[in-house]
Amino acid sequence: MAKEELLEFPGVVKELLPNATFRVELENGHEIIAHTAGKMRKNRIRVLAGDKVQVEMTPYDLTKGRINYRFK
């Protein structure tokens, strides 16, 4: 089965939620719930409120996403 195309959007972390999840406001104004990617957890990259991040989402559920990069 082919890997589905992921949608990538820049956004800003608005709120930290329990269980290592975050409320992220995307550039287009939508708010989603996102968790950190495994490589970010492994390398202990911290994400705080106000950080600019890159979020990838699947086209099947546009309310959830994965944070795969934190901009410096």
Swiss-Prot record:
UniProt entry keywords in alphabetical sequence: Cytoplasm, Initiation factor, Protein biosynthesis, RNA-binding, rRNA-binding
Keyword Calcium appears in the UniProt entry? no
MF terms from GO for this chain are:
ribosome binding; rRNA binding; translation initiation factor activity
Q: Pfam families, from UniProt?
A: eIF-1a
> Domain S1-like, which positions?
1-72
Does the keyword Membrane feature in the UniProt annotation?
no
- Return the GO cellular component terms, semicolon-separated: cytosol
Please give the function described in this protein's UniProt entry. One of the essential components for the initiation of protein synthesis. Stabilizes the binding of IF-2 and IF-3 on the 30S subunit to which N-formylmethionyl-tRNA(fMet) subsequently binds. Helps modulate mRNA selection, yielding the 30S pre-initiation complex (PIC). Upon addition of the 50S ribosomal subunit IF-1, IF-2 and IF-3 are released leaving the mature 70S translation initiation complex.
Q: Which family does it belong to?
A: Belongs to the IF-1 family.
Q: Which PANTHER family match?
A: TRANSLATION INITIATION FACTOR IF-1, CHLOROPLASTIC (PTHR33370:SF1)
HAMAP family with a match to the protein in the record: IF_1
Q: What is this protein called?
A: Translation initiation factor IF-1
